[in-house]
Amino acid sequence: MTFCYPCRAFALLTRGFTSFMSGWPRIYYKLLNLPLSILVKSKSIPADPAPELGLDTSRPIMYVLPYNSKADLLTLRAQCLAHDLPDPLEPLEIDGTLLPRYVFIHGGPRVFTYYTPKEESIKLFHDYLDLHRSNPNLDVQMVPVSVMFGRAPGREKGEVNPPLRMLNGVQKFFAVLWLGRDSFVRFSPSVSLRRMADEHGTDKTIAQKLARVARMHFARQRLAAVGPRLPARQDLFNKLLASRAIAKAVEDEARSKKISHEKAQQNAIALMEEIAANFSYEMIRLTDRILGFTWNRFYQGINVHNAERVRQLAHDGHELVYVPCHRSHMDYLLLSYVLYHQGLVPPHIAAGINLNFWPAGPIFRRLGAFFIRRTFKGNKLYSTVFREYLGELFSRGYSVEYFVEGGRSRTGRLLDPKTGTLSMTIQAMLRGGTRPITLIPIYIGYEHVMEVGTYAKELRGATKEKESLPQMLRGLSKLRNLGQGYVNFGEPMPLMTYLNQHVPDWRESIDPIEAVRPAWLTPTVNNIAADLMVRINNAGAANAMNLCCTALLASRQRSLTREQLTEQLNCYLDLMRNVPYSTDSTVPSASASELIDHALQMNKFEVEKDTIGDIIILPREQAVLMTYYRNNIAHMLVLPSLMAAIVTQHRHISRDVLMEHVNVLYPMLKAELFLRWDRDELPDVIDALANEMQRQGLITLQDDELHINPAHSRTLQLLAAGARETLQRYAITFWLLSANPSINRGTLEKESRTVAQRLSVLHGINAPEFFDKAVFSSLVLTLRDEGYISDSGDAEPAETMKVYQLLAELITSDVRLTIESATQGEG
């Protein structure tokens, strides 16, 4: 059905839907826009809608808003104009017909409830669909947009009206007045009306269905942005106390400690007080202002990637569990800030009990932190209360965040995962909840980590300083230029899908009352944890600092001319761009020269100038600290570095022999650095890397052999140096195993560390993780898994010597002699 233009123009004029540039509506909107421009400072989600959502501005675009609000419409208009999107107040002209560029799904409430305007959305949808019927080349992009002023979820008690209600004019005025600077314009992926018309038709029932689906979309979107209501804290405690698991634990506590039931119950309440968050939207708003100021002053930018996939999961009703790597105490604040600005609910965060000091503890608690002790051993009541609290968060639909590494990485590499909280997450699923739980791995990276100096001291044996107010103030006083931050969301892991694939009968273990530990739980949790670490590394972010540190630390003198550094960075960048580590990893778009200029602004390097040019130097006192940043991306370059080391040593080598060498060493590298490839994927990866190294001129390919190219030998040697220290560590352990096949695990780890420390001193190895206990412990476990150490604990001497000989070829002769002489007690 179509309307003549005069009738339509009259209808649009009476509803105020006419062009912004004509008649009294122009005056009306200008007058309304004046206070809004002062009161409202909205943010767009996503930050750049057109490219991030794939909008084609050369094709018609119409906007769909949830309900009639001129304030929302003008707020949308401001964001559209700021991002070069069509003005929603300019009508669309299609085949001589003028149509509004925006549609309100619902007329919205009024101050005077007896006045209910006729809804126009169905009629307008039908008009648009009808035009697609008559014009087969037409394809209008329908973009759902919601404008939110404030995102308080409200409390379960004490509110007559639900927090997601539509506002009438007076309510909207006060919302804009109070929350105008806490407003978001959320653009959703577009819907093709051409596809709708082709697949479903163009009659009025389809228009009605479109309006109904749009209503559901906006309701889900607001719930994803605001979250479920918050409980009164005491009501939550009462519910937990009434649970069968805690009631039984209280009885056991009273019996084992020979105390009264009331005293045991008080102990349980005290633990709840210690653990539970006290979420406050007003604290979120205040902290958002402070953090916004902090990021703008000290950081040069926060780079966020792949957030749309998380927004979609939240929109689809998934229970989100954020699992980031842990670099710094700043992670807590940065991730909550990023999620809030991506239109998502800040999560409840599992924080170490060491952060529960005044004033940080109460502040973190109001920002959603719940506190967890380092160990649950020996305290059944505590473990039960914590598990029930975590399960209650899941059952109520709150997003949760925890650091699967258990603590901050002191080396810049991922730590082996701690699986306790992850195990409780799966146990929560076994209560039979209806919402699917999805784990979101997250890579967090920085160009400057405030605690990196402290980490280096701790790795050298210093006692960890207890977190306190003075320590926090000292840290804040050192804030300077922190460069850029990176938050990359990795590939989500839907737990239900994972369990269906790997434990098909997992539903048989569901118990809505008791926490269960089926036989499959521990191995499954371990596999999930390892997979999560791989997915975190898959989302790695290369940046100016970690690339420059990688190159300078590869140089034995920790210095390169600017030309050499530029050439080396180009090598790294081309490898990462042309043979990406994964589809989720990110590489700077800037040139090598621009990255060097940026890194020099961080004041970590020195520059000496002479008549020939600049020499960029990494000072000795900074070298140990800079290994942290190199290690952030070690996994992204270790395979090409290993290939370069093998080719450099042999001068020329066939692809098959190269593949054999890599295949021997890869299991250790995969376990240590959580690499993404399985063994059967290596041939294709090595071929791709070899072709890229040939393209760069680092090697030549002749008759299926890789030959070193003397013209670029320095670049190849610096690339090879990225694997140097790792290969030296492996050589230490394999030599010790070969020399003493019956050595026990503890002694092997201890002696490996002793030799590594000796090597570090004698050969100027600056990396603290070179003799880190955890690294050698992980290596020895991998050797057992790979069969180098038998079930009885003895090594297989023939196999270990074979691997040592391979490694001995890849390390320098002086390092090899130091390793071999150390076991003989020689100097």
Curated annotation (Swiss-Prot):
Subcellular location: Cell inner membrane
Membrane topology, as annotated: Peripheral membrane protein
GO molecular function, one term: glycerol-3-phosphate O-acyltransferase activity
Superkingdom of origin: Bacteria
Catalyzed reactions per annotation: sn-glycerol 3-phosphate + an acyl-CoA = a 1-acyl-sn-glycero-3-phosphate + CoA
Subcellular location, principal: membrane
Pathway(s): Phospholipid metabolism; CDP-diacylglycerol biosynthesis; CDP-diacylglycerol from sn-glycerol 3-phosphate: step 1/3
Keywords: Acyltransferase, Cell inner membrane, Cell membrane, Lipid biosynthesis, Lipid metabolism, Membrane, Phospholipid biosynthesis, Phospholipid metabolism, Transferase
NCBIfam families in the record: plsB, PRK04974.1
HAMAP family given in the database record: Glyc3P_acyltrans (MF_00393)
Record note on domains: The HXXXXD motif is essential for acyltransferase activity and may constitute the binding site for the phosphate moiety of the glycerol-3-phosphate.
Protein name, UniProt field: Glycerol-3-phosphate acyltransferase
Gene expressing this chain: plsB
